[in-house]
Amino acid sequence: LLKCNVKFIFEGEEEIGSPSLEAFCRTHKELLEADVILVSDTSMVSAETPSLTTGLRGLAYWEIEVTGPNRDLHSGHFGGAVANPINVLCKLMADITDADGRITIPGFYDDVEDVSHAEREMIAQIPFDEAKYKAAIGVDELFGEKGYSTLERNSCRPSFDICGIWGGYMEEGSKTVLPSKAYAKVSCRLVPHQDHEKISKLFEEYIARVAPAYVKVRVTPKHGGQGSSEERSVG
């Protein structure tokens, strides 16, 4: 018999940002009080390597809407004279990271602690086959922030991703349209000490500052969460 109480929480909204979880935990704070919390939504290094996860990256998520003309236009009549919202959106998104994989938003790295020498040594000891990793996901080359290994990039460093982008004509065949609107859903993975609300504000201010005057850009925050990291033995 266990000599302690065990409480289970089964939560099915994780993929949409867990909109109900925080309020539930606040309402039932006393019921959920515990000395140790174990999260099962993590992965193993490999099928042969037992893993204990001591930290997770946080998240900030937005939807972006770029509006140009008041309706879809014919590119033969208006192309080159009116800004194309999809072109503008692609340029805005492409400029958020530089050629070295670093995020260009001013202030973004202010609260980021670099990977320590001890952490790098510990990560380097993890059994990791880069060739198998690439083969499993079907890519020939990997890309990420310069100066960091693959395992450092996907665990200890922040990142920016376009999760979805759309606009204009997307049916079969072709249509020479200059679209009225373009949309994107984007996210940043954050590391501990990066506050997702602060990052969200920095992102919104950055887009407002660099967006050209010939389109209207609206940024809508969707959800976010703090990264976490626990004390661990290194060496």
Description of each model-found segment:
Residues 1-55:
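Acidic/histidine-rich catalytic neighborhood of metal-dependent amide-processing enzymes
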Residues 45-47, 61-63, 67-235:
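Metal-dependent amide/peptide-bond hydrolase catalytic core
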